[in-house]
């Protein structure tokens, strides 16, 4: 198998197309609109479920005939439509692809260890961290699902473990599969364990979950028995904190690639981009591009998606316990801290969007996705420039407002500056986002 490169050639960045993911309808790197890219994305970053989950089609139903559960009418594993291969409610007596029976809402098991109470968390200076498994910490595929290009890269049914590439064979219930750990996954767990009591929560079956968690945590030092699977979930189509005894909203942080899986806990959620390493996963989410495995590429360790998440977790943890200290242990709520951390990114920036006749005015008006993102990050958005304006966001360098920014020595940036800040949870260097003829095209 050829050696996998991490991140590709920096000199050629950004690597678009294919687009690595979309933030509220825009590519997180180049800023292209999703509807203009013909599905050319490896994964979807921080968007709504309708943006994130691509319809898998009936072919997927055949490869996942017993679906573990459905989110917004799509199988949580293969992406097939709920009507394509049976619904979760009709499969209660069946064994799913991972071998566990799909549990009815009234009959979950209760084997999940109890979460520490608030007093214990405050004493140990820890919070609760719930991590999704598939597409967040790793990606798995069946050995017979490799594409022709992947087979040419050495991905065959006879493939062996390759720890150097973090590729491992697993066989839950005798189904041969290959799991690829996401770069930085083990480092994330090692560093986060000092700040959090950690759980894995997946809608997949328990044996599949436990086999893959063992790859991440072979000695059980990070998770122990704190693994929530479809057996423990009360519903096959959503996740809820009530399956973890003692878990309180005010002390729980959630990291997941699917926001619709947590309809009751959106304020606890740190939404991240979906990890789709194998071609079969790209196909299931309807991305007609070469997979990372096909291209011999992977996310970078030092500044990939999980490294970004760890940085956010550090800030949330610090913010929570700073609040505990300031209020003598009272009223600290991690949900408010997450909003505050997010809202600090562009705090102090007053942004005005500049349009040209060639651009879609709806793209930058009030309540548009880019306007909402800027406000979520703490910026003040205005319709017209004045002495308080700090940034003019434009694609065309010849607009009146763009010229005003140059004349008044204000920051003139293209829209990617806001999108990148949202992806990285940090204000970006304005010089890296110039407005020129290329951005106007």
PLM-predicted stretches and their roles:
Residues 31-32, 87-93, 141-153, 204, ...:
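Short coil/turn segments at secondary-structure boundaries
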Residues 206, 210-250:
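Substrate-recognition "cap/lid" segment bordering the active-site pocket of phosphatases
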Residues 27, 42-43, 341-417:
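Interaction modules related to DNA damage response and DNA replication/repair
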Residues 55, 107-122, 129, 179-186, ...:
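Eukaryotic beta-rich interaction modules
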Residues 21-28, 71-74, 124-137, 188, ...:
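Core residues of folded domains in eukaryotic genome-function proteins
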Residues 180, 185-214, 230, 351:
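Substrate-recognition element of Asp-dependent hydrolases with the DxDx(T/V) motif
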Residues 1-126, 138-160:
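Long, acidic (Asp/Glu-rich), low-complexity accessory segments flanking structured domains
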Residues 185-186, 259-334, 346, 369:
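C-terminal folded domains that constitute the principal catalytic or ligand-binding module
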